[in-house]
A protein has these predicted regions:
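Short glycine/serine- and acidic-residue-enriched loop/turn motifs that recur at repeat junctions
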Residues: 75, 79, 98, 126-148, ...
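Short coil/turn segments that connect the beta-strands within blades of beta-propeller domains
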Residues: 113-114, 123, 159-160, 169, ...
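Conserved core positions of repeat-based scaffolds
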Residues: 115-118, 127, 161-164, 173, ...
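Ankyrin-repeat and related helical/solenoid repeat scaffolds used for protein-protein interactions
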Residues: 384-414
Length: 414
C-alpha cells in the first residue's frame, strides 16, 4: 500500500475514534440530565403504579355501569318502587326456600311479609325467608320452646308475628308484640304497663279457653293484626288499630261469612254473601271481571250468584263466586298481568293472594298467576301439572300435589 493511502486511512480512523469518544461523552452527559415529563403524565404514572388505587377505580367504573347502564337491560326495574312489607331486609336468597323436611308433607303455607310459615301434616311448624324483623331484634324463627311441635293444626303469618292453633284449640303467638300483635290487656297491666287505646288486645276469652278447632273457619293475619273467624260468623280480632282505618267498625260488627286484610282495610263478606263490608260507603261497591276491565256494580255483576270466598292483596280483593267465577275490586298497577279467560267447562276452585298478585287453581288442575309481576310473581315454571293445592307468600306462590308434595314454587327468591 502506498504511503498516501496509509495516511488517508490513518486520518479516517482518528476521526471515527473522535466521533465515538464524543458520542460517549454526550451520552454520559445526557444520563446526568433528568427526563422532563409533563405533570399530567406524572400523575398518571404515579396512579398506575399503585395496584390498590387501580383496583378501586375499576370497581367504581363497574358500579357506575351497573347503576346507570344496567337498568336499561332490566325492564321490570324501577328506582321509585317501594313496599312497606319488604323493608329492612338483609341480603338473602331464601325467600322461597321451602325446608326439605316440609317439601313432601305440606299441610299449609302462609306468608305476608319477609318470611313464610309452613305446617306439615305431622303438625310441625317451619319458617323460612328473612326472619329477623327489621331493627326490633325479634327473629320469628325462634319458635317458642313450649310450642307443641307435632300437635299444631293451623298457622298464619303476619308482617312481624306468627299465630298458630294446636289440636287442642290453644292459640300460640310469637314474634313482635309491641303493638298488640299478641298479649292480653291483663298481661300488660300485670307487667306494670299502661293500656294503649290504639291497641285491640288479644281476647281474654281466647287466652283462657282457646277455641273449638272444628268450629274455626279461618285463621288469618295482616299488618300487625290477626283474626279468627268461626263457622257461626263470630269474629275475634286483635292487633294494632292504627294499621287499619276500619278496625273499630269490625270490632263492633255482627256475624261475618268471610273476611281478610288488605294493607289498609279489613274487608268482610256479609251473611247474605252479596256484598263487601268495610264500613266505608262506596269503597268496594263496584267490581271488575278482570284486571283493568270496566267496573260494574257488584249487585249487577253477581246477578243472583253469591260470594264464596274473599282473597286480598295489599290494594285489591278477589271474590270467588258460587259458580267458580272470579271478580276483582280495588287498585291494580297499570302494568298488572290480566287473569286468563277460562273455557266454558273450567272454573276456579281456589285462589290465593300475595302482596300484589293472585294465583288460581281450576277444576282441571291448571294453575294461573296474575297481578303485578315486578318481582317475578307471575313467572310460573313449566312444571305445574298434577296440582291439587296452592298457597301464597307475599311475593311467592307454591303448588302442591295430591300427595302433599311440593310440585313447584315461583316468585321472589331474594
Amino acid at each position: 500500500m502506498s504511503e498516501k493511502k496509509k495516511s488517508f486511512f490513518k486520518k479516517a480512523n482518528k476521526k471515527n475514534a473522535a466521533a465515538e469518544n464524543l458520542s460517549a461523552a454526550e451520552r454520559a452527559k445526557a444520563a446526568d440530565v433528568e427526563e422532563i415529563v409533563s405533570p399530567m403524565r406524572q400523575i398518571v404514572n404515579n396512579f398506575m403504579s399503585r395496584k390498590l388505587a387501580v383496583g378501586a377505580m375499576v370497581l367504581l367504573i363497574v358500579m357506575f355501569i351497573t347503576m346507570f347502564v344496567g337498568p336499561l337491560f332490566m325492564p321490570k326495574y324501577s328506582d321509585s318502587y317501594t313496599d312497606v312489607t319488604q323493608q329492612n331486609i338483609p341480603p338473602t336468597m331464601s325467600l322461597a326456600s321451602v325446608p326439605g323436611e316440609l317439601k313432601n308433607d305440606i299441610k299449609m303455607i302462609d306468608g305476608y311479609g319477609t318470611f313464610t310459615v309452613g305446617l306439615s301434616n305431622s303438625g310441625h311448624v317451619y319458617i323460612w325467608g328473612s326472619t329477623k324483623i327489621g331493627t326490633t331484634g325479634v327473629d320469628v324463627a325462634n319458635i317458642p320452646a313450649d310450642l307443641p311441635q307435632g300437635n299444631i293444626a293451623m298457622v298464619a303469618a303476619g308482617i312481624d308475628h306468627v299465630v298458630a292453633i294446636d289440636n287442642d284449640g290453644k292459640i300460640w303467638c310469637w314474634g313482635n308484640k309491641k303493638l298488640g300483635q299478641y298479649g292480653t290487656e291483663a298481661e300488660v297491666l300485670a307487667a306494670g304497663g299502661e293500656v294503649n287505646p290504639n291497641i285491640a288486645y288479644f281476647p281474654q276469652e281466647l287466652a283462657d279457653n282457646g277455641v273449638v278447632l272444628s268450629e274455626v273457619k279461618k285463621l288469618t293475619c295482616g299488618y300487625q293484626a290477626s283474626a279468627i273467624l268461626m263457622n257461626d260468623g263470630t269474629l275475634y280480632l286483635w292487633g294494632n288499630k292504627n294499621g287499619y282505618k276500619n278496625f273499630d267498625l269490625f270490632l263492633a260488627a255482627g256475624a261475618m261469612y268471610d273476611m281478610d286484610f288488605t294493607l289498609n282495610y279489613i274487608v268482610g263478606v256479609n251473611g247474605r254473601r252479596n256484598s263487601i263490608f268495610t264500613g266505608s260507603r262506596g269503597l268496594y261497591d263496584v267490581v271488575r271481571p278482570n284486571v283493568g276491565a270496566k267496573s260494574v256494580k257488584i249487585a249487577t255483576y253477581l246477578d243472583g250468584r253469591t260470594i264464596e270466598d274473599v282473597v286480598t292483596t295489599n290494594n285489591s280483593l278477589a271474590l270467588i263466586l258460587s259458580d267458580g267465577d272470579v271478580c276483582f275490586a280495588g287498585d291494580f298497577s297499570s302494568d298488572a298481568v290480566k287473569a286468563p279467560t277460562l273455557g266454558a267447562d273450567e272454573h276456579y276452585v281456589d285462589v290465593v293472594g300475595g302482596a300484589m298478585h293472585y294465583t288460581g287453581l281450576t277444576n282441571k288442575g291448571n294453575v294461573y298467576t296474575w297481578g303485578r309481576n315486578n318481582l317475578d310473581q307471575c313467572e310460573m315454571p313449566g312444571k305445574t301439572t298434577g296440582v291439587s293445592k296452592i298457597y301464597g307468600g307475599s311475593f311467592q306462590s307454591y303448588a302442591v300435589d295430591e300427595n302433599d308434595d311440593l310440585v313447584s314454587s315461583w316468585g321472589l327468591k331474594g
